[in-house]
Amino acid sequence: MTLPRSSRSVAVDGAQPYTITIAPGLLADDARLARHVRGRHALLLSDSQVAPHYAAGVRAALLSARPDLQIGELVIAAGEASKTLDTFGSAITALAELGATRDACVFALGGGVVGDLAGFAAACWMRGVDCVQLPTSLLAMVDSSVGGKTAVDIPQGKNLVGAFHPPRAVLADTDTLRTLPARELRAGLAEVIKYGAIRDPLFFQWLHAERHALLDSDPAALAQAIARSCEHKAEIVARDPLEKGERALLNLGHTFGHAIETEQGYGAPGNDNLNHGEAVAVGMVLAARLSATLGMSDAQDTEALRALLHDFELPTDIPPGLPPEALLARMRLDKKNIAGRLRLVLWRGIGKAEVVPDVEEAAVLKILAG
């Protein structure tokens, strides 16, 4: 695979098409930022880790191009624990206090939590205003900022309250990865590995070959990984924007992973609970093991996946203290389930994921029990 130029763009087709731009320096590109604000109001939503680095610069860039803008700001506590209905309410209040009209724009400056919250607030305010995703984590660049899924968590489960709301644009400034903690970089790489696992064996091999460059945050390697991941997601989302079929493949490992996240209380900066990417890494191995148990795949493929995740210093086992029965109960609330039956994304080997309905709970419980 050849390395890309410093700037890449990926078109997402559909009823509301948009472009993902991947390049350094985008947060300082005043004209590019401002062109997406149709009216006079903009809300900049960020978190306590990202805002000190970038919020003032984004505000200054917007005002440089559009001095007439009225810009509100909302900074939330960093971490999944902030992705709640209460915080969503704070975003709605911020839009109301700004006097935002239907031509307003919400800028999501941060990782997946910020993107989900900002997108959901934009979807709901006046039945829908524009949202521009400014992802600052690798995970957000390759997954959560793309595709228009927005949601918050409730105690019963992750992402159970939300809406589909495609962004007006995604501007992935790769310079922001310089300030990304190593653990968060690895979490994003779990989602990158997912794309190879579900539909691209050559990408899977490339990730193994480039593992040292990626872990060292080599700009060219990261740009290639981001672009290839976004290309895969864009192709699938264009064909299945509302997740009626093929788009569910993007959830390999997520049913198991979301159950782990919910049962342990969600990861947050500074705690030992698995973050989203880490939980997905474990979930992918569990899905691969279940596939092998059901006779769908070879155990060698499971081991290849486990080995690649280990190469990227990601976990592959369920954390201790999480009862299998409790995890299964969480899985029963997964959004992909139909008529009370488990519907999981499994695989027939590397690059061959598929959705499997009516998976027997006994088989899942056996995998959860180790």
From Swiss-Prot:
Gene3D superfamilies, per database record: 3.40.50.1970, Dehydroquinate synthase-like - alpha domain (1.20.1090.10)
GO terms for biological process, alphabetical: amino acid biosynthetic process; aromatic amino acid family biosynthetic process; chorismate biosynthetic process
EC nos: 4.2.3.4
Entry GO CC: cytoplasm
Main location class: cytoplasm
Subcellular location: Cytoplasm
CDD domains named among the record's database cross-references: DHQS (cd08195)
Keyword Cell inner membrane listed: no
Record flagged with keyword Hydrolase: no
Binding site for NAD(+): 112-116, 136-137, 149, 158, 176-179
InterPro entries xref list: Dehydroquinate_synthase, DHQ_synth_AroB, DHQ_synth_fam, DHQS/DOIS_N, DHQS_C
Family according to the record: Belongs to the sugar phosphate cyclases superfamily. Dehydroquinate synthase family.
Protein's name in the database: 3-dehydroquinate synthase
Organism of provenance: Xanthomonas oryzae pv. oryzae (strain KACC10331 / KXO85)
